[in-house]
Amino acid sequence: MYPLNSIPGRKDVAFIKAKHGKGAAQNGRHSGSCAQAPASRWKQVLLTLLIFIALLALIGGALWQNICYNRTHYTAEFYQVHSRKLTQSCRVVFLTDLHLREYGQDNCELVQDIHSLAPDLILLGGDLVTYGEGSSYDNMLSLCSQLSEIAPVCGVLGNHEDELYFLDGDQALVEKFTAAGVTILRNQEARYTVRDNVISILGVEGSPADFYNYGASTFMDSVEPQTDYDLRICLAHVPTYFPEHLENYSFELGLAGHTHGGIVRLPKIGPLYSAEEGFLPDYAGGSYGLANNATLIVSRGLGDSSWVPRINNVPELSVIDID
């Protein structure tokens, strides 16, 4: 007989057992790693989700702050316009689309800012009120009265005043403006002498679709031959009035509002939407050249009339220096 440890093939058996035992241990380790892998993936998913939520919160907070800021603040935008005949420079302040908003009690902040700008003329682009928001316009009329103590004030009606006038039959609306010291131009001209310069202000009523129906074309034809002025400014509430019709006439400066700056202004793209032009409008805030070599300034306005908030679009008080 052979000793136990000298049995032929015994070492081989022991080696095989050891090998199998090592493999089993390795298999045990692999089984543990597989059990941990799903937990690791869930941690990654949870972390990604938390980062996404944090980014959404930051973006939402920034948007909300922007919206709130745009409801309580405005900026003075300065424009420079050159005139061929003006002998002395003058300053015009243009405000539009206030929609009954107040900046300070009784618009004291707005009035103080305009007073400090020392304008020679104050021009209104319409929509100082909002149709359907009650019949009391005391704050608007008070603002007009305060402005008339600073400089001569004239302007045009916007579509919201037109709705009050034509749909609600508020025939006294223009009289209320007049009593507050404002000259409302409804296809009419007003003239002012400013620093020895005669300034002609044309006020065109309605929208571009109304040009041939309610007297605007007849009015513009009637004043076209005039040359006895040093500067002519044309007012219209809707900016597309100018490229569609008004740039065929003689004036040096056009002023309009209505678009609220496109409501949302996208970085590197510009205004998002206007009622007349749809998405990505051409005329929704800023300075533009017209075919008659005039400058058109479209104000972003001072207020809002819809539930859609302004985003990246601070309300504007336009200040135009003409020399």
Annotate each PLM feature:
Residues Y2-L86:
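N-terminal membrane-anchoring alpha-helices
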Residues Y79-V93, V182, E189-G203, T227-I233, ...:
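Beta-strand-turn-beta hairpins that frame and shape the catalytic cleft
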Residues Q88-L185:
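Membrane-embedded segments
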Residues L95-L100, G126-L128, N159-E161, Q188-E189, ...:
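Active-site metal-binding loops of divalent metal-dependent hydrolases
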Residues L98-Y103, T130-G134, S207-N213, R232-C234, ...:
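Short, flexible loop segments at the rims of nucleotide/cofactor-binding pockets, characterized by
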Residues D120-I122, D230-R232, E252:
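Conserved acidic residues
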Residues D168-V182, V194-A236, F242-E244, W307-R310:
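Binuclear metal-dependent hydrolase catalytic cores centered on His/Asp/Glu-rich metal-binding motifs
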Residues P239-S318:
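Conserved beta-sheet core of the metallophosphoesterase superfamily
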